[in-house]
Amino acid sequence: MSISKPSQEQLSKLIKYFQDRQFVDAEKLAVSITKEFPEHQFTWKVLGVILIQVGRLNESLTATQKSIELNPTDSEAHYNLGVILKGLDRSNEAEKSYRQAITLKPNYAEAHNNLGNILQELGRSNEAEKSFRQAIVLKPDFTEAHNNLAITLQELHKLNEAEKSFRQVIALRPDYAEAHSNLGITLKELGQLKEAEKSYRKAISLKPGFTEVHNNLGLTLQNLRRLDEAEKSYRKAIALKPDFTEAHSNLGITLKELGRLDEAESSYRKAISLKPDFAEAHNNLGNTLQELGRLDEAEKIFRQAIALKPDFAEAHNNLGKNLYKLGNKDLALESIEKANNIDPQFQDARLLLKVMKSRKSREESENATGDTNNKCTKTGLTSNPLILNRVVEKELIANLYEMSSRELDKTIDARYGNGKCSPDFNLFQDSRSIIQNVAKDLTKIMMEAVKSEVYIIGSFFNILSAGGGSNPHNHLNDLDKDIGFDLGKQKYSLVYYLSVGDQHCNEPGILKLYEPSEDILPCEGMITIIPASRMHSAVYGGKTDRVMIGANFYSL
């Protein structure tokens, strides 16, 4: 006895309606067929998909479950059930459905991809990575899976792999604006700011109204110190989306750096009006008010930032700085200590804590002895360079070449040209015994030079090849220039020449000092210490590398 089923004409018409996106007609026909042929599994499955398309997920769930009941081995039906359950925020059940689809059809690339999405949503990124990779193995040109893999790798901080995956996405689909945007984000995290800029601009050319990319481009331009361009990008983002809170806040940061404090204040207040619990915007507003000399207002704003985010180390630190300027030194020290306790790696808080404790100890000593002479700047150093020497271990140079590095041209500071440098400013924290030995020796030399304890704020190495160098610069940052603390007078820069390279050339790498002008031709083992405020530059053109270690430090 044959089982009755719909005619081929009915099924062809149903499929045609669906393919032409005539979902109303498709639903009517599917419902009609299921009433006439209630055991016809395929029609129930199609009805479920139609209802997904029109957003009626609960009804779709019923139809799809019916199709699975009629044919439990239909992998596509289990896949559809996973889609529905995910849409209903039932992720754990969706995972089971996708896994069942894969069990029934192991080479089901789309199911592997969607399983990866669910695992990512559930916070199981390592498992998600495996699912996306399996989808790609099964379907190498699966653009969506490549993109999902890249995003997962980005979140797992496997940035080099993420970059490769995003580039693969773009190779498969050159007009995919989101992939260009995500590549830009990855490149920015890798410190490749100029390349990130190119990716963002490509995304914008493909999708001019891509608001988030205008904002991200602004952040990159800001990091490249192209502040006028950054301002334009933020304003474009705001024009596209007037309630874009982050763009208003970022615009405020740029305007402050441009010295347009009143405008910066307005931008921060706009961001706060859009998002009253935006602790970072409160903190930035406090900094602007502080710079405008409105210290009482700044204190209130910093306290609001802390109320919104009690573990906000930067806000505690800024409150401490503000209280110090108001003359409340004990309360200031308490705030700085809180910042340091919250984030022991917060460089500014660590520095200020050292400086403030040192100053307090000195003041107490002076008050006890009656000696009120200010010894803060009696370091034994003037604006003139101090020239010293240390024997260079050859293995020290070899170790620097073995360490991870970045190209000079990839930095955003004064360094440029051929050569490489340490990836960060924490060279002295490297555990190699040879590095620890040189750090110990140089620290002792610093202390003897300034006649006090010291706090090292940064340490690094530079390896200059022909054409490498540094533009005129000094080593003062915003905190050093803050007249409330006057730290610039306590800051010094040291350079230790391990190998001077080839000095028989037109550009032998003279250390050029400014105001007053002075030229120093380095020799092997030379250590030069100058005030961090003194401008200096160097250009090197030799055939062999010049190798040096640098450090910036404060006298305490």
Positions of the model-derived regions?
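Catalytic core of non-heme Fe(II) oxygenases with the double-stranded beta-helix
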Residues: K451-Y540, D545-L556
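Non-heme Fe(II)/2-oxoglutarate
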Residues: S361-E453, G469
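Canonical positions in the second alpha-helix
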Residues: I33, K66-S67, A101, A135, ...
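Alpha-helical segment of the N-proximal tetratricopeptide repeat
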Residues: P6-E36, V46-V49
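Conserved alpha-helical positions within TPR/SEL1-like repeat arrays
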Residues: I15, F42-Q53, T64, E76-G87, ...
